[in-house]
C-alpha cells in the first residue's frame, strides 16, 4: 500500500463522514518538509461536524493510530503526517527485490481481453511518422494493460480498401512500370499516388475513373482484384520490416477488406431494428438524441457502403471473437466525430458493450510547424528516419564509450527508443514538432537520458559486484534516498493512472522523474564508500534500475545495461 492510501485509510477509520477516495484526493504535500510529508486539511469537515477546522484537526490527530507513522500532529486546521522513512524504505526495497520485474503487477483485468485498434497504415502508401503515434501509443498501452492483468489483443486494421485503390489502379494503368514497382514497391506506388492526385485537382474525369475502378474491385473484377492483392502484399512486406525495427508485433492484420462480406449483416440488423432512414436516396441513422447533429451515413445513394458501416461490422466481429472488456481505437483526433457516431449507432442498436469502447485520440506530428500530407508528398518516412536516429545514437555512444561491446545493438535500442520515447512523453492530445536532434540527445527529458541513467546504475552494481538478498533488511532515511523511495512506491499507482487515462505520457514523465532523482542522488552521494550505508545504497540502486527498466519496457523502449 502506498503512503497516501495508508494515510487515507487511517483517517477514514476515524472520519466515517468521508469516503476514503475523497480523503485521498484532499491530501496535500506541505511546501515545507518540516511540516510533515503529507497533510489533511480539516476545512471540508467543518460543516458536517459543526466545529472549527482547528478543533477538528486537533481532535482527529489524537484519535489516529500513530503506529504506522513517525508522528501525527495537528497544526492549525491541518493534520500533518510524518512518515517513518526507515520503515517504509525497508518495505519498498524488500518488495522490489523480491518481485523483480513483476513489481507493481496488478490483477484488475483478471485475464480479460482488451482489443487495441492501432497503427493501421494505408496499403500502397509509405509508413510515415504520421503512423508512428498510433503504433507506439497502442503498443505502450498493450504493455500497460498486460501489467494491469488484462490480455491485450493488438489489431492492425489495415487501410486496404477504399477509393484510393481506384486512384492507384488508374495511375498504374496510365504510367506504371511493373519492374520498377517490384524493385521499390512503396516508393513507386507513392510517386504514382501523388501524381494521380495532382492530376485529379485539374481533371475531374480522374475521380470518375477511380470510382469506376473501385466499383469493379468491389464487384470482384479479376484485373482489379489482382492489382489490389499485389499492392497489398508488397506493402505488407515493407511494413513488417519496419515493425521488426520498432519491435512491435500484432495479433491480427484484419483490415478493412476483411469486413467486405460482413457488412450485409449490419444493414440487416439496422433494418430489423427500424433504424435506417432514407435521406436524399442514402440510408442514414439519426443520432440527435445523443446530441450528434449529423446522422450516420450508412449507405450512399449509389449503393456503396461507408467507413462507419465497416467499423460497425468490425466492432461486432471483435466483440464476438474476443469478448473484450475494453476496446480501444488509437486513432487521430480528427476522427473524433466518427467514433462518437460509431458508439451512438451501436447504443441505438441495443449493444450496451459499446460503453466499453474508447477512442484514444492524439494530436498531429508536424515538421517545422507544417502539417504532413502523403497526398502532397510532404512526409517524413519512418525507415530513413529510424536509420538516421540510430546513426546519431551511434556517434554519441562512440564519443562516450568507444570500447563498448555490441555497439550496433545498443545504438539501435537508443535510436529507436529515442523516437518512441519522445512521442510518448508528449500528452497524446497535444501534437509535437518532429526534431531528431532533440529526440536523440542524452541531455534533457529524452529517452537516451533515461536509458543512460539505467546503464549508469548497472555500471555501479557491476563495480560493486552487488546482488541484493531477499532475506537482508535494507533501509535508508536521508532526504535524497527518500525522494527515490517515494517514486518507486508510487509506481503501481502510476501504472493504474496510465491505464485509466489511456495516457502513456504519465509513465514517460514518471521515468524522467525517477532518472532525474537518481542522477541528483548520484551527484551528492558516495555510493561505493565502504561504510555501514554501502549495501543500503546499492539496494536502492538495484531497485531504481529495476523500476526504470520496467517503466521503459512499458513504453516499448529497451534499457541497455551499458551505453
From Swiss-Prot:
Its main location: cytoplasm. Keywords: Aminoacyl-tRNA synthetase, ATP-binding, Cytoplasm, Ligase, Nucleotide-binding, Protein biosynthesis. Gene3D superfamilies: Arginyl tRNA synthetase N-terminal domain (3.30.1360.70), HUPs (3.40.50.620), Isoleucyl-tRNA Synthetase, Domain 1 (1.10.730.10). GO terms for cellular component: cytoplasm. It is found in: Cytoplasm. Its EC number is 6.1.1.19. It is an enzyme of class 6 (ligase). PANTHER family: ARGININE--TRNA LIGASE, CYTOPLASMIC, ARGINYL-TRNA SYNTHETASE. SMART domains: Arg_tRNA_synt_N, DALR_1. GO terms for biological process: arginyl-tRNA aminoacylation. A motif ('HIGH' region) lies at residues 121-131. The gene is argS. The keyword Nucleotide-binding applies. GO terms for molecular function: arginine-tRNA ligase activity; ATP binding. Signal peptide: none annotated. Belongs to the class-I aminoacyl-tRNA synthetase family. Monomer. It catalyses: tRNA(Arg) + L-arginine + ATP = L-arginyl-tRNA(Arg) + AMP + diphosphate. It comes from Streptococcus pyogenes serotype M4 (strain MGAS10750). This is Arginine--tRNA ligase.
Amino acid at each position: 500500500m502506498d503512503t497516501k492510501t495508508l494515510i487515507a485509510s487511517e483517517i477514514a477509520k476515524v472520519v466515517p463522514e468521508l469516503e476514503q477516495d475523497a480523503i485521498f484526493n484532499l491530501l496535500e504535500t506541505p511546501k515545507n518538509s518540516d511540516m510533515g510529508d503529507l497533510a489533511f486539511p480539516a476545512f471540508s469537515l467543518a460543516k458536517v461536524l459543526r466545529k472549527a477546522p482547528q478543533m477538528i484537526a486537533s481532535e482527529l490527530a489524537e484519535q489516529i493510530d500513530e503506529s504506522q507513522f513517525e508522528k501525527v500532529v495537528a497544526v492549525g486546521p491541518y493534520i500533518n503526517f510524518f512518515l517513518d522513512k526507515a520503515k517504509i524504505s525497508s518495505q519498498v526495497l524488500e518488495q522490489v527485490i523480491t518481485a523483480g520485474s513483476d513489481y507493481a503487477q496488478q490483477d484488475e483485468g483478471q485475464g480479460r481481453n482488451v482489443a487495441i485498434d492501432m497503427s493501421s497504415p494505408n496499403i500502397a502508401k509509405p509508413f510515415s511518422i504520421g503512423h508512428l503515434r498510433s503504433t507506439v501509443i497502442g503498443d505502450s498501452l498493450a504493455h500497460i494493460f498486460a501489467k494491469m492483468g488484462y490480455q491485450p489483443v493488438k489489431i492492425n486494421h489495415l487501410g486496404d480498401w477504399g477509393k484510393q485503390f481506384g486512384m492507384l489502379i488508374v495511375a498504374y494503368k496510365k504510367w506504371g512500370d511493373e519492374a520498377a514497382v517490384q524493385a521499390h514497391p512503396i516508393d513507386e506506388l507513392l510517386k504514382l499516388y501523388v501524381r494521380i492526385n495532382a492530376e485529379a485537382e485539374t481533371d475531374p474525369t480522374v475521380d470518375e475513373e477511380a470510382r469506376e475502378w473501385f466499383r469493379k474491385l468491389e464487384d470482384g473484377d479479376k484485373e482489379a482484384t489482382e492489382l489490389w492483392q499485389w499492392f497489398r502484399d508488397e506493402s505488407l512486406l515493407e511494413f513488417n520490416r519496419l515493425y521488426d525495427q520498432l519491435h512491435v508485433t500484432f495479433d491480427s492484420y484484419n483490415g478493412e477488406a476483411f469486413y467486405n462480406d460482413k457488412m450485409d449483416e449490419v444493414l440487416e440488423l439496422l433494418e430489423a431494428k427500424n433504424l435506417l432512414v432514407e435521406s436524399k436516396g442514402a440510408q442514414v441513422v439519426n443520432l440527435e438524441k445523443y446530441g450528434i447533429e449529423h446522422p450516420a451515413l450508412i449507405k450512399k445513394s449509389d449503393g456503396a457502403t461507408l467507413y462507419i458501416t465497416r467499423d460497425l461490422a468490425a466492432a461486432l466481429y471483435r466483440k464476438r471473437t474476443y469478448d473484450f472488456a475494453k476496446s480501444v481505437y488509437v486513432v487521430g483526433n480528427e476522427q473524433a466525430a466518427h467514433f462518437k457516431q460509431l458508439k451512438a449507432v451501436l447504443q441505438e442498436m441495443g449493444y450496451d458493450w459499446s460503453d466499453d469502447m474508447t477512442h484514444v485520440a492524439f494530436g498531429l506530428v508536424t515538421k517545422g510547424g507544417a502539417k504532413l500530407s502523403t497526398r502532397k508528398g510532404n512526409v517524413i518516412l519512418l525507415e530513413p528516419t529510424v536509420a538516421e536516429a540510430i546513426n546519431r545514437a551511434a556517434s554519441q555512444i562512440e564519443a562516450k564509450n568507444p570500447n563498448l561491446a555490441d555497439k550496433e545493438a545498443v545504438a539501435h535500442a537508443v535510436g529507436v527508443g529515442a523516437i518512441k520515447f519522445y512521442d510518448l512523453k508528449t500528452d497524446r492530445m497535444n501534437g509535437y514538432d518532429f526534431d531528431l536532434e532533440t529526440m536523440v540527445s542524452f541531455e534533457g527529458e529524452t529517452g537516451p537520458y533515461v536509458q543512460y541513467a539505467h546503464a549508469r546504475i548497472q555500471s555501479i552494481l557491476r563495480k560493486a559486484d552487488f546482488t541484493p538478498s531477499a532475506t537482508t533488511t535494507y533501509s535508508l532515511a536521508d532526504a535524497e534516498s527518500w525522494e527515490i523511495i517515494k517514486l518507486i512506491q508510487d509506481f503501481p499507482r502510476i501504472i493504474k493512472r496510465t491505464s485509466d487515462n489511456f495516457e502513456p505520457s504519465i509513465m514517460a514523465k514518471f521515468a524522467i522523474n525517477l532518472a532525474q532523482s537518481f542522477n541528483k542522488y548520484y551527484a551528492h552521494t558516495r555510493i561505493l564508500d565502504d561504510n555501514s550505508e554501502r549495501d543500503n545504497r546499492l539496494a536502492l540502486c538495484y531497485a531504481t534500475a529495476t523500476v526504470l527498466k520496467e517503466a521503459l519496457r512499458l513504453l516499448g523502449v529497451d534499457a541497455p545495461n551499458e551505453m
